[in-house]
UniProtKB/Swiss-Prot annotation:
Binds 1 zinc ion per subunit. GO terms for biological process: D-xylose metabolic process; L-arabinose catabolic process to xylulose 5-phosphate; sorbitol catabolic process. This is Probable D-xylulose reductase A. Its cofactor is Zn(2+). Xylitol dehydrogenase which catalyzes the conversion of xylitol to D-xylulose. Xylose is a major component of hemicelluloses such as xylan. Most fungi utilize D-xylose via three enzymatic reactions, xylose reductase (XR), xylitol dehydrogenase (XDH), and xylulokinase, to form xylulose 5-phosphate, which enters pentose phosphate pathway. Keywords: Carbohydrate metabolism, Metal-binding, NAD, Oxidoreductase, Xylose metabolism, Zinc. NAD(+) binds at residues 182-187. GO terms for molecular function: D-xylulose reductase activity; L-iditol 2-dehydrogenase (NAD+) activity; zinc ion binding. It holds the Pfam family ADH_zinc_N. The keyword Oxidoreductase applies. SUPFAM superfamilies: GroES-like, NAD(P)-binding Rossmann-fold domains. It catalyses: xylitol + NAD(+) = D-xylulose + NADH + H(+).
Length: 359
């Protein structure tokens, strides 16, 4: 991997192929419309999708065919604004929503812009990501951070936005019992959002005890470590150990692992709600008989939509969710490749990469 250039104007972390990355000085982006702003990117979180592109060169139909800047969980400082920008000014600290919809297709007009047919999403081929010094995006996809939210915390508005969308899909209401499978960053944040929405019992499920220990301190009221027994047995044990009666109200899978999907269906009460937030294999077996006979409400969840980022910022600003606890490391920009290697091995919970030239 080539080393970074000290005099670079817009140093970027570029994926060329599987396990092949480089630092490249790219042109400073320009305003594409009067409604755009240019942001000096200060912090970027490493997401599982970034690591997957680095490790495999593709995610499903999205294949890296040309060099692509990685990263999409970012925050920064506004350095330039378009002539029509009214909600931001130079110097504002912002969280950056990295997916820009066309605003014209049927899903966009229906208010589901996360399903936009022409979505331009950062670090999803063929679009460059945010691991660069500068990035351009529309003003309404930048969320001004109050003084109570630091720039490192601002980078976590992206995974928190994902969690907000998942929990909204589940329609979690006060007094409910929610089971969350997968205690990675998104799963942990789902626990926190469910708590903020009034869930009275939140059970975090994972096979790694350290993650369960953290989940219990962070937002979960209970934890469950599944055995290698069939999903029905794990579900029965979870119900018994937590006195869930006929089952949980809501099950959220943030792991994408087939045994979790099965256990999630079986742990629900009749009429309960299941939301698939984690992505695993493109196809897997599914307990359709249990889903039908219990008349479950089953939904998918993809990224985030209208109001999700805004609510994420509000939940942190109000003190209901403390995302700072998830940040287990901040590395220099020149150490980005090693950070990717560390994240692949499961080191830490959320690692941030500081922008070029930052301490």
């Amino acid at each position: 991997m080539s080393s970074q250039t000290p005099t670079a104007q817009n140093l970027s972390f570029v994926l060329e192929g599987i396990h092949r990355v480089k630092f490249e000085d790219r042109p400073i982006p320009k305003l594409k419309s009067p409604h755009d702003v240019i942001v000096n990117v200060k912090y970027t979180g490493i997401c599982g999708s970034d690591v997957h592109y680095w490790d495999h060169g593709a995610i499903g139909q999205f294949v890296v065919k040309e060099p692509m800047v990685l990263g999409h969980e970012s925050s920064g400082i506004v350095t330039q604004i378009g002539s029509a920008v009214t909600s931001l000014k130079v110097g504002d600290h912002v969280a950056m929503e990295p997916g820009i919809p066309c605003r014209r297709c049927e899903p966009c007009k229906a208010g589901k812009y996360n399903l936009c047919e022409k979505m331009a999403f950062a670090a999803t081929p063929p679009y460059d990501g945010t691991l660069a010094k500068y990035y351009t995006l529309p003003e309404d996809f930048c969320y001004k951070l109050p003084e109570s939210i630091s720039l490192p915390e601002g980078a976590l508005m992206e995974p928190l936005g994902v969690a907000v969308h998942i929990v909204r899909q589940a329609n979690v209401t006060p007094g409910q019992t929610v089971v969350v499978f997968g205690a990675g960053p998104v799963g942990l944040l789902c626990c926190a959002v469910a708590k903020a929405f009034g869930a009275i019992r939140i059970i975090a499920v994972d096979i790694q005890k350290p993650r369960l220990d953290f989940a219990k301190k962070f937002a979960a009221t209970a934890t469950f470590e599944p055995s290698k027994a069939p999903a029905t047995e794990n579900a029965t044990r979870m119900i018994a150990e937590n006195d869930l009666g006929r089952g949980a109200d809501v099950a959220i899978d943030a792991s994408g692992v087939e045994p979790s999907v099965h256990t999630g269906i079986h742990v629900l009460r009749p009429g309960g709600t299941y939301v698939q937030g984690g992505m695993g294999r493109s196809e897997m077996n599914f307990p359709i008989m249990a889903a039908c006979t219990k008349e479950l409400n089953i939904k998918g969840s993809f990224r985030y939509g209208s109001g999700d980022y805004k609510l994420a910022v509000q939940l942190v600003a109000s003190g209901q969710i403390n995302v700072k606890e998830l940040i287990t490391g901040i590395v220099k920009f020149e150490d980005a490749e090693q950070a990717f290697k560390d994240v692949k091995t499961g080191k830490g919970i959320k690692t941030l990469i500081a922008g070029p030239g930052a301490a």
